[in-house]
């Protein structure tokens, strides 16, 4: 099964350019904490905007330019460790703090990733099955002409790996 994960467009861009190599998430509204980790080891990133349901007008198609492999995943239980990671990401620190504190169990799930740039960009039409505040989606097969190139590691990627080791 081919999986897609909705992520902020700014984060997708940082990953595509090698400036970020970690994904952070909390449990979704309909998920328990134990269900919300990164069980899928390879998936496409669907760029989105925070709470897209508030957007006016038709929802744009997904421009998918990155697939990722999860190298390691786990839980971050210590806010000080999350704080050290934040400068190496495109996430908004205030929003991440709210996510960390949003449940009785204070934690964020992380996935250390190896991203792959896609060429050409996969234009996935928006549909009702891809709507809503869910994070994970089943996707149709990608176009047959899609090629992948590993995104080279940067100093930010190396620092992130050290912080998560």
Q: Language-model features: where?
A:
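Structured alpha/beta reader/binder surfaces that contact nucleic acids or chromatin modification marks
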Residues: 1-165
């Amino acid at each position: 099964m081919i999986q897609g994960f909705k992520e902020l467009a700014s984060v997708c861009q940082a990953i595509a350019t090698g400036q970020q190599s970690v994904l952070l998430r909390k449990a979704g509204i309909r998920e328990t904490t134990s269900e919300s980790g990164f069980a899928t080891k390879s998936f496409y990133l669907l760029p989105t905007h925070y709470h897209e349901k508030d957007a006016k007008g038709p929802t744009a198609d997904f421009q998918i330019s990155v697939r990722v492999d999860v190298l390691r995943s786990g839980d971050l239980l210590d806010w000080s460790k999350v704080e050290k990671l934040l400068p190496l990401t495109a996430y908004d620190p205030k929003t991440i703090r709210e996510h960390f504190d949003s449940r009785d169990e204070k934690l964020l799930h992380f996935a250390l990733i190896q991203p792959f740039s896609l060429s050409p960009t996969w234009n996935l039409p928006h549909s009702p099955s891809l709507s809503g505040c869910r994070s994970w989606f089943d996707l149709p097969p990608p176009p047959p002409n899609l090629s992948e190139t590993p995104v080279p590691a940067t100093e930010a990627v190396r620092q992130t790996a050290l912080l998560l080791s």
